[in-house]
C-alpha cells in the first residue's frame, strides 16, 4: 500500500514520468490517496477521466463526474478523484456502456484497453503473500491489496487467481508453472505475453504472438494470465 505524507499537492515535475500529463503546461497534479497501489504503480482517477478517457477537459469537470459515482473501479463506484487505479484494475462506465482494463505498456508503463462487457466483472490478481491464520486457514494477499481466505487450495505466491467482481469470489487458480502464459509487467518487454519455458532465478519465455521471439525476466515482473492462452483480453 502506498502512503505519502507532507503536502496534499504534487508538483507535476515530481510526478511519475508515466502520468498522462503535459508537465510543462501544469504546475500541480493531483496527489493520489493512500490505497492498494503505490504512488509509482498507479494513476489517480482524475487523470484517467480527464487525460486518458477524455471525458472532461478540466479537473473540475472530472471531479464532478467522479463525485456523481459514474465511474466504477472493479465493480464499485469510486467518488474519490485521488483514488489510484493500477495494474489489472477494471474501469466501467455503465452510463455509456464501456469497460476498460489497466495493462502494462513498455513506454507509458500503464495504459487502458477496452474490454467486452462479458469481462467487466472478472479480474486477474497475482498472489504476493501467503500465511496461516487462526483455525489453520490460509490467508492470501494479492498485488492489489485484497485478502482471500481459502481452504484446500495449494496456492503459492506467484500464482494468479481469476476472481469475480465485486464479490472477489475465486473462479479459477492459475499456477506459475512451465507452460503457463505470463504477462510481462515491467521493462522493455512490458505488455508482451509469453509461455514459460524454464523456471529458475531467471524465467525463460517464448512469445505467444511471435514464437521466434524469446526473452527472459524475473518472477516479480510477471503475472500468470492463463494456462495455455490468456483467460482475459490483455492486448
UniProtKB/Swiss-Prot annotation:
SUPFAM superfamilies: Alpha-L RNA-binding motif. HAMAP family: Ribosomal_eS4. One of its GO terms (cellular component) is cytosolic small ribosomal subunit. Belongs to the eukaryotic ribosomal protein eS4 family. One of its GO terms (molecular function) is rRNA binding. This is Small ribosomal subunit protein eS4. Keywords: Ribonucleoprotein, Ribosomal protein, RNA-binding, rRNA-binding. The keyword Magnesium does not apply. PROSITE patterns: S4 (PS50889). Residues 43-114 form the S4 RNA-binding domain. One of its GO terms (biological process) is translation.
Amino acid at each position: 500500500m502506498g502512503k505519502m505524507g507532507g503536502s496534499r499537492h504534487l508538483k507535476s515535475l515530481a510526478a511519475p514520468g508515466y502520468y498522462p500529463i503535459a508537465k510543462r503546461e501544469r504546475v500541480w497534479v493531483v496527489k493520489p490517496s493512500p490505497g492498494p497501489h503505490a504512488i509509482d504503480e498507479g494513476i489517480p482517477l482524475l487523470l484517467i477521466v480527464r487525460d486518458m478517457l477524455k471525458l472532461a477537459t478540466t479537473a473540475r469537470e472530472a471531479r464532478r463526474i467522479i463525485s456523481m459515482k459514474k465511474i466504477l473501479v472493479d465493480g464499485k463506484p469510486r467518488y474519490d478523484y485521488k483514488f489510484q487505479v493500477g495494474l489489472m484494475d477494471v474501469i466501467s462506465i455503465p452510463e455509456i456502456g464501456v469497460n476498460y482494463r489497466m495493462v502494462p505498456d513498455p513506454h507509458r508503463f500503464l495504459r487502458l484497453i477496452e474490454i467486452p462487457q462479458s469481462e467487466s466483472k472478472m479480474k486477474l490478481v497475482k498472489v504476493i503473500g501467503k500465511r496461516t491464520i487462526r483455525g489453520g486457514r490460509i490467508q492470501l494477499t494479492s498485488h492489489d491489496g485484497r485478502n482471500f481466505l481459502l481452504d484446500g487450495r495449494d496456492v503459492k505466491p506467484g500464482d494468479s487467481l481469476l476472481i469475480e467482481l465485486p464479490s472477489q469470489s475465486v473462479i479459477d487458480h492459475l499456477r506459475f508453472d512451465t507452460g503457463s502464459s505470463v504477462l510481462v509487467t515491467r521493462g522493455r518487454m512490458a505488455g508482451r505475453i509469453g509461455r514459460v519455458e524454464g523456471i529458475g532465478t531467471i524465467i525463460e519465455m517464448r512469445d505467444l504472438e511471435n514464437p521466434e521471439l524469446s526473452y527472459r525476466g524475473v518472477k516479480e515482473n510477471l503475472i500468470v494470465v492463463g494456462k495455455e492462452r490468456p483467460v482475459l483480453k490483455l492486448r
